[in-house]
Structure formats: C-alpha cells, structure tokens
C-alpha cells in the first residue's frame, strides 16, 4: 500500500518533512505485511480495514475517534471490534463507523452533534458501540460527512443522522440535528446503488443513474444550477442522461463517474479541485475535458483535491489543493488540471514482463482519499491482481434485488430456520417497493439508464418469468410471504407522490403477479392496487399513462381483463357486502382504473375499443334504472332511496357497455323524452279542457298524415309544422285513405318507402359508388337543403323509434355524426380504387414521386358528364405532389371528399338527425355501433332465426312444410340467406339486439303450389304456401327472391 499527503503525527515507516508532509507516494511499511481491504480517512485520522475483518486506526485521538486508548502514531487494532467481522468502514471529521458482515453498524469518536447515532450527544465515545436503532435493519453501505452520517439498508430504506445545519440529513426544514438514525422518506421506492457524504452535503445514486443531492450548496456542490442549500433530496437533472455509476464527495465539491468512464465535477474550485483549468466554482456538472481521451474507472475526493485512475495506462491523475502534498506530484502547489501522480505505474503485469526493472513498478488495485491524505492499494509484478472498477456495482452494497438467486437463498433459509427472524428478513425485502423497482431492469444496451417519464426501463418479461416460477409448489412458502407482504405492507404504503420515475416501476410489476387474477384476492390485492394508482398525484399519474402507452398489447389486455373481472366479481357479489359504502368504493376504484386505461387506449389503440365491453352487465344491472339514476344525477336531482340504493352509476363509465346496452340506454332516453313530451301534451290538454278550448288540445303522439303518391312532399310538410319537442313523441303514421292502426308495421313501412324515395338517384342527392355499393353526398346537387334535413330527421326518427332501415352509407357518415374525423381508411371503404391509389402514393419507395405520379394539389370530379378540376388548397393547380408533401396531399384529398365538397348538404342532414337523436347518450357510441343501431349488423345466427320464429295458421315448428322450408333455407349460401332477409324485412342486416329480435312470422295460405311465397316486409311476415316437396319449395322461394326489387308490401 502506498500513501501520501499530510501526516501530523509522522507515523513510523513514512518519511515526512518537518511539517508532516509526504509529497509523493511512499510505501506504508507499518502495515505492509497485512492484506488491506479498505481505507477511510477522516479530518486527522485514518481507519484501515483488513481482509480478515480486523480494524486498525491511527492519527489524532482527541475525541476517541481511534476506538482505542493508545497513541495514534501508528495503526493499532480496535480490540472492541475483534469479535466482529467488519466489511466496511467510514470516517467523518472526528468520528468513525464500522459495518459488520451481519449488517450491524458500530460508531465511535466525536458525538456532540449526534453523528454517532447513539441517541445521545456525548462529546466523545472512545469505544465502538452498536447503533441500536438500526439493529432491525441489515445495513449494506455507510458514508460520513464531517458531522453527519448516511446508511443504506438492504430493503432500500435510507437513514441519516447527525448535524443538520444545512439540511444535509435530507429530512426537511423542520428537523434539527438528529442523535439517532432517521428514515429519509422522500427517497422511498427508489432502488439506491450508493450514498455519499461530503463536508455538509449528501448524495444518493439510483441503480439507473439518477443523482439526488441535498445539504450545503454554498459553492454549487449539489449541481443544481444555483448556490442555495437544500433540506430535501433534489434530482440533479443535468446528470440524468449521463449514466452515472459512482459519486465521490469532497468538503465542498463533488465528482461523479459515468459508465463510459467519463468524469464530471462541480462545486468549489478555488484550489483547482474540479480539474477545469480554472479556480472557479461550478454550479452545474461539467465534464473534465482533460480526461476525455481516457477511460476512468475509479475516482476519489479528499477535502480539496480529486483523484482519477485510468487502468489503460495504469496512471493516477490528481488535481486540486497540493499544499499538504495530497496530490502526490512531488510538490506542494495547487493543480488546476489532471496531472499524473509521481511514481512507477503499470497497467498490468503483461506490460512489465519484458522489463528488467519490472519489480519497482506498481499496479493499482484501488484508490482511497479523504481529508488531506491519499492511499493506494497496489500489487507488484509477481502478485498482480486486477484493479477494482467502480463502474461495476457490487450487489452486496446496494438495495437488495429479488431474483432467482435470492429466491433460492430464502427457500433454503425458510426450510432450515423457519423462525420469526428469518421470516422478518424475507418480508422486509418483499415489502419494499425499492427492492422490486430495482429487480427487473432492462439491461439490454443499458436501456434502464434511459428511464424517464416516457420509458420505464424495466424488463416486464423477466418479471413475468420470475412470478411464474414462484407459482410452482416448491416455492409455496415464498409465495405465502409475497402475498402477505403485498397485502399488509407494500400496496397499502404506496405513496401518492413518488420521488422519481424509478419509484413507479412497481405499478407495472404488480399486475404481473398471477394471484391478482384470482378472484379470491380481488378485495385484498387487485382493488387496493387500483386505489393506490388512483391516489397518484397528477404528474406521476401522467407518467404511468405514458408507460402504459409503451407496454405491449398483451400486457395491456391483461390489465384491462383484470379489472373487468373485478367489476363482474363485485356486481355478482354485491348482495354479500354488508356495508354498501365498501361495495361503492371497490367498484368505483375498478371502474375508474378501467376509465384511466380506456383514455390511454384512445391515444395508442393497444386493443380494440370493444375489449373494454362487459356484456354480462346487461344481465346483472337494470340498465334503465341505472340510466335514470345517471340522468337525474346529471340534472342535479336525487332519486328516492326506495328506487335506487347504490350511488355508483355504471352509465358514468359508458365504455364498458356493448352496443346492445348502449342501444338500451338510447331507447331509455328516447322513452324518457317521449314521456316528457307526452306528459307535456297531456298537461296542456287538461288546461285546454279547463279553459273550454278543447280544439287546441295536443296529441301525445307525433302523428304524420301522408299520401302514398306524394310521400316526400307530405313528409316535408308534416315535419316542418311540428316543433322539436313533438319530434320526441312516439311516432304514428297514417296513410290517407287507409284505416290500418299503426302498431309499428305502418311506421316501418313509412320509413322504408320514404328513404327509398329520397335516395332515388333521379334526385342526384347522393353519388353511388359501384365498387363498394355505397352512397355519399353528391358534391353537385340542386335540391333544396330541407331535403337533406328531412333525411336526417327520418334517420333520427328511425333510431328513436327502434326501426332498422336499409341505408348504404359508409362508416365516415357515422364518424362525422360523432365528431370523429374520417381518414384514408374511410375513403378505401367508400371508393376502394381511389383509396388504393392514395395508399400506393404514400407507400412508394422511390425519390421520383413527381415524375411517377404526375399529380398536383387538385382533384377531378364529374359533374353532369363534365370533368371539373377542384383545388385542394389555394393555388393547388401550381403545387406539385412530391415525396415531402404527399401525406399533406392525401390528407387534403380525403378532407375534400368527406368535408369540403359536401359541407352544405351534410350540415343540413346532421342538423336534422341531431334534432331528434342528439344528446349525451349518442356520444357514448362508437361509429360502428351507431351504424349497427341504424342499419343493423351482420352478426348472423341462422339457427337462432329458426328458434325464435313464430308460426300462424296451420303451421307449427313440426309441420312438414315448415321443416322443408328450414332445410332448404339452411342449405342456401350466405348471400342468398341475406337476400331472404332483405326480401322479408326490408334489410339484409339484423338489429343490434341480434337475430332473436327479428322474430319472423311464417303463416300458411290457401294458395296452391304454383304460387310464390309473399313477404309482408313491415311485419316480418312470410306467406308460405303448403309445398309438397323440397324441390318445389326451393324453386318457388328462389324465384321470389330473384324477382324482388323493392318492398313487397301487403
């Protein structure tokens, strides 16, 4: 071992000048025959830790800091620690700490500021004492400032004690100096790799390189861009991306080492200790440029000097104060730039093998510095050992991790010593968010060093693998401890304001625990986790949203299904909850978490929107009652307790409802508004009777009088004379000259006939796209706006009166009605040829887009046989489409088709539609759901069609003709079956409630076999003659379908 610097007592074996200065490296002869593991330097004393765990001290002993009564002119063993195996030592100005292999911490020396942690402020303690308050902890790492101490426990808990004059304990403003270890809660949850103390400032380093500083900052030694002291840990943001792996502190300056071997310094620079070729202070971390060409693996700070070791050359560089020889350069001058320490240094033994003088060279193993002294552990050529690399973190020194190795150790311990101490040790780690947060880091290309509000830096796959292993029966004892730890400690103690993003990984880890999926643990694990997530403050909550945006769809799907399952579990067992408020709290937490996930999914589309549906809800909850409660709540009214017991309304979370449930809600809303309109009419009628004006009485229905031969004109006239409130009434249609009572069939016939008439191509209101069989608003139309308004009202009335109509509009229409902007996919649906062409333009890989496609910002449209060119942007005919603007061209093209060219007609249509159907309930629908509600869907179940059919006349399900009919029908191909639906019901799609809601009717007729089947479209009624054979039935039915062109009305 070599040493240099200031030796006030002039220890034997070291040659000093009269002032006790050693200006260049000398061999410490007094301890050369012992194997030194570690050296700690205080203000004027040193502590030597040997490989065998013995501790020696020398130097000034005025406060008992040597731990023995002997003079300090040579290293003497501390007898009081002889029975302990010490693995780590640290020194303050006049006090010392020693850490045993059992995680126990001993202190001695000056104690007037509480720096010994012994719950007293004795001026001095000459014999090492155990710090009792930490006895229940396994301490892994300690560091001393001048008058304060830091300690890191295995479970990630961080303790400080001693002087707090500048906030160096990190406990906040209200705390004075502390005579016993205090937990620093502001860093909880962060997996810490290192703690380091300077004169009166402190640092903590996370496993992923986040640096936190606090305490004295008079010279900028915290790196926080100012010179203000900090009473609580503050994130040094300028170092976040530097992959910091080690920190060393001087009295008023700080040095950090990065994974790439770079060195940053900041703080006091009055002696050149920052190495920036100046004597200036630095308030921001600044890289030491002189060392940039070298890969540094070790750094150490003394009071006012800094050391850096470069293994490739074997050289130690020193800079800063040299007045007491502490730089080892052979002189006592201050040095502003890194300078090599004097001596014979070699990188490794191979470098020396050919040299005759190889035996005088030193190969550095580790450097130590403190106060005005420096020590170097080194080896000679013949017993070379590789240098310690501070960039490689020693797992024994930082927050314990949960992995295969620790699980194996715990399993063995629990099987051998299943006692309280063993269990408590395991539970301490398992209950620590910090331990879990550091256990599954994404180490591929150092990804975890990039941890940020957008990147969690965690390998969820390894999390999943570990939990799956733990589900094995051989780990049952560990699993039991994990379960208990999660239930009683970890989840209940999760903070609403995590100190850093690294403390938030636990929210991604916990959902991977398989027992969360088990309904037995919904109340004790799954729901409490949801509550913890929902308690998060705004910023951490946004971070979790960002991370959920980054996870794989499989993980996201599992999370959604987890809380859907919890909602179902709670609804099914709601009667078992003796305290209703508990049920409300639990289900609200599950629903709000699903809502949070749903909002994330709206942005990133991990899963389809219907993944959030809980179809079973319709059977577990009265949708009408729930909607009524929601409606009253929205209106600021309260329902009578006798009507509604629970305060949670599922309608507040519409994303969990499938299309059928939403349709039920819309129909409930329609019935509610119809009732309001009817009641209003009835009230007015009573008033009119009382005032003898019965002729002015209002009908409780929306009654339309129309003629078949002037259907459009009459409909326009009738609807124009009714108020918006009238449109909310139940619809009844009367065809002039016909006495039929409208029980629903006449209304359906009215819709079918009116829409067929309005959509007739002769009016030119809509353009028919042959390759998609769809209609869209014509961009050149000469009919009045009120025609489009009428179509809108008609479509709204159809929905309002639960009637499916046969409309061939693309999904884009329903998107626009719900304020969703149509895109290229919608153009592909409407006009596949145009859509494919635009996609090819976007996908074209070459640079020659202009020459290949020859396009400008215009669109060609046919108007009454004439091709017209429309500009997509001002001056579009002079703007050529190129590689850089092609996306802009496609966006403008799509916008023209769906927005600009049809704005007038669509506005008239939507105002009519929304006049009837507008409102909050409509906003709950997805575009595809709104389309399915208006025109039905294609979820065919032909067996169900047969099972729900009704028979009249001579027919029954067992009648021979009926059997022949169904045999024939089920043999039809899909397109022919759809044609039958169109023939019988007026639409080839089925209502949103499914095939059962069609309930077709088949009745016998007296007609002979030569007659065709006849469909009464308005009533879903089929007149079926009694055919004698399957062949005749098939032929006649096929002929009827082939001859069908419009509505076959009775």
UniProtKB/Swiss-Prot annotation:
Q: How is it modified after translation?
A: Ubiquitinated; which promotes degradation by the proteasome.
The keyword Repeat belongs to this UniProt entry's keyword annotation: yes
Indicate the residues that form the catalytic site. 1018 (glycyl thioester intermediate)
State the EC number(s).
2.3.2.26
Q: Which reaction is the catalytic activity of this chain? A: S-ubiquitinyl-[E2 ubiquitin-conjugating enzyme]-L-cysteine + [acceptor protein]-L-lysine = [E2 ubiquitin-conjugating enzyme]-L-cysteine + N(6)-ubiquitinyl-[acceptor protein]-L-lysine
Which ranges form a coiled coil? none
Q: Where are the RCC1 repeats?
A: 1-51, 52-101, 102-154, 156-207, 208-259, 261-311, 313-366
Explain the purpose of this protein.
Answer: E3 ubiquitin-protein ligase which accepts ubiquitin from an E2 ubiquitin-conjugating enzyme in the form of a thioester and then directly transfers the ubiquitin to targeted substrates.
Which protein are we looking at? Probable E3 ubiquitin-protein ligase HERC3
Organism from which the protein derives: Homo sapiens
């Amino acid at each position: 071992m070599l040493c240099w610097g200031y030796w006030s007592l002039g220890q034997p074996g070291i040659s000093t000048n009269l002032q006790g200065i050693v200006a260049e490296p000398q061999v410490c002869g007094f301890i050369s025959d012992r194997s030194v593991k570690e050296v700690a330097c205080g203000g004027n004393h040193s502590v030597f830790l040997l490989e065998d765990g013995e501790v020696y001290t020398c130097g000034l002993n005025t406060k008992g800091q040597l731990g023995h009564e002997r003079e300090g002119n040579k290293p003497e063993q501390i007898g009081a620690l002889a029975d302990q195996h010490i693995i780590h030592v640290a020194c303050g100005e006049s006090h010392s700490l020693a850490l045993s292999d059992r995680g126990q911490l001993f202190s001695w020396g000056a104690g007037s500021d509480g720096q010994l942690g012994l719950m007293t402020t004795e001026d001095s303690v000459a014999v090492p004492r155990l710090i009792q308050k930490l006895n229940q902890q396994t301490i892994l790492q300690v560091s001393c400032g001048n008058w304060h101490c830091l300690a890191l426990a295995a479970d990630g808990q961080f303790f400080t004690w001693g002087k707090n004059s500048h906030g160096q304990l990190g406990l906040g403003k209200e705390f004075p100096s502390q005579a016993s270890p205090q937990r620093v809660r502001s860093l909880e949850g962060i997996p810490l790799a290192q703690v380091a103390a300077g004169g009166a400032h402190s640092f903590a380093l996370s496993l992923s390189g986040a640096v936190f500083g606090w305490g004295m900052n008079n010279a900028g030694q915290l790196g926080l861009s100012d010179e203000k002291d900090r009473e609580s840990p503050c994130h040094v943001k300028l170092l976040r991306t530097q992959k910091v792996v080690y920190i060393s502190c001087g009295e008023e300056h700080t040095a950090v080492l990065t994974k790439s071997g770079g060195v940053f310094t900041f703080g006091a620079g009055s002696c050149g200790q920052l190495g920036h070729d100046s004597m200036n202070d630095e308030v921001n971390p600044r890289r030491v440029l002189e060392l940039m060409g070298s890969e540094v693996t070790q750094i150490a700070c003394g009071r006012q000097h800094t050391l850096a070791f470069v293994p490739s050359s074997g050289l130690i560089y020193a800079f800063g104060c040299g007045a007491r020889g502490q730089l080892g350069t052979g002189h006592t001058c201050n040095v502003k730039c890194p300078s090599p320490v004097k001596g014979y240094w070699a990188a490794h033994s191979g470098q020396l093998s050919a040299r005759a003088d190889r035996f005088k060279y030193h190969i550095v193993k580790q450097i130590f510095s403190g106060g005005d002294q420096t020590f170097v552990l080194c080896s000679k050529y013949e017993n070379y050992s590789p240098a310690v690399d501070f960039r490689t973190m020693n797992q024994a020194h930082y927050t314990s991790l949960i992995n295969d190795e620790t699980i194996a150790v715990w399993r063995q311990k629990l099987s051998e010593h299943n006692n309280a101490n063993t269990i408590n040790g395991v539970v301490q780690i398992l209950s620590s968010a910090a331990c879990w947060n550091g256990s599954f880091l994404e180490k591929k290309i150092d990804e975890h060093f990039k941890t940020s509000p957008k990147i969690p830096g965690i390998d969820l796959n390894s999390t999943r693998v570990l939990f799956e292993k733990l589900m094995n029966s051989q780990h049952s004892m560990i699993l039991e401890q994990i379960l208990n730890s999660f239930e009683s400690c970890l989840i209940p103690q999760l903070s609403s304001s995590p100190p850093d993003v690294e403390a938030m990984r636990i929210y991604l880890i916990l959902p991977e625990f398989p027992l969360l999926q088990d309904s037995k643990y919904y109340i004790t694990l799954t729901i409490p986790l949801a509550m913890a997530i929902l308690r998060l403050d705004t910023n951490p909550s946004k971070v979790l949203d960002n991370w959920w945006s980054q996870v794989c769809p499989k993980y996201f799907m599992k999370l959604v299904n987890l809380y859907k399952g919890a909602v179902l579990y709670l609804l099914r067992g709601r009667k078992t909850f003796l305290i209703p408020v508990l049920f409300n709290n639990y289900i609200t937490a599950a629903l709000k978490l699903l809502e949070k996930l749903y909002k994330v999914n709206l942005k990133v589309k991990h899963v389809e929107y219907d993944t959030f549906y809980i179809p079973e809800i319709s059977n577990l909850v009265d949708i009408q009652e729930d909607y009524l409660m929601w409606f009253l709540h929205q209106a600021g009214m309260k329902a009578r307790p006798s009507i509604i017991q629970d305060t949670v309304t599922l309608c507040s979370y519409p994303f969990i409802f499938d299309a059928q449930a939403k349709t039920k809600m819309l129909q409930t809303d329609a019935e509610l508004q119809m009732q309001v309109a009817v009641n209003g009419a009835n009230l007015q009628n009573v008033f009119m009777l009382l005032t003898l004006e019965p002729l002015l009485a209002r009908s409780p229905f929306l009654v339309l009088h129309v003629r078949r031969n002037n259907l459009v004109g009459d409909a326009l006239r009738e609807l124009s004379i009714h108020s918006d409130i009238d449109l909310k009434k139940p619809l009844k249609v009367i065809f002039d000259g016909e006495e039929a009572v409208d029980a629903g069939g006449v209304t359906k016939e009215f819709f079918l006939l009116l829409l067929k008439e309005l959509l007739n191509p002769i009016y030119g209101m809509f353009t028919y796209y042959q390759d998609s069989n769809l209609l869209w608003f014509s961009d050149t139309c000469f009919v009045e706006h009120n025609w489009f308004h009428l179509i809108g009202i008609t479509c709204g009335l159809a929905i309002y009166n639960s009637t499916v109509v046969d409309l061939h509009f693309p999904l884009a229409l329903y998107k626009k009605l719900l304020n969703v902007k149509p895109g290229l996919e919608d153009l592909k649906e409407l006009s596949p040829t145009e859509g494919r062409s635009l996609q090819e333009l976007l996908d074209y890989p070459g640079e020659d887009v202009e020459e290949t496609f020859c396009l400008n910002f215009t669109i060609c449209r046919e108007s009454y046989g004439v091709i017209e060119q429309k500009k997509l942007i001002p001056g579009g005919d002079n703007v050529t489409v190129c590689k850089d603007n092609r996306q802009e061209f496609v966006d403008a093209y799509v916008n023209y088709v769906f927005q600009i060219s049809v704005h007038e007609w669509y506005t008239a249509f939507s105002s009519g539609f929304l006049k009837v159907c507008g409102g909050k309930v409509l906003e709950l629908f997805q575009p595809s759901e709104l389309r399915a509600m208006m025109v039905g869907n294609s979820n065919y179940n032909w067996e169900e069609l047969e099972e729900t059919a009704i028979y009249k006349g001579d027919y029954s399900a067992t009648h021979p003709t009926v059997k022949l009919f169904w045999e024939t029908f089920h043999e039809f191909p899909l397109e022919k079956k759809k044609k039958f639906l169109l023939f019988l019901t007026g639409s080839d799609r089925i209502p949103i409630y499914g095939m059962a809601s069609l309930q077709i009717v088949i009745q016998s007729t007296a007609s002979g076999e030569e007659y065709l089947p006849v469909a009464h479209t308005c009533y879903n009624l089929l007149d079926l003659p009694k055919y004698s054979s399957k062949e005749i039935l098939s032929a006649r039915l096929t002929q009827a379908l082939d001859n069908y062109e419009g509505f076959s009305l009775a």
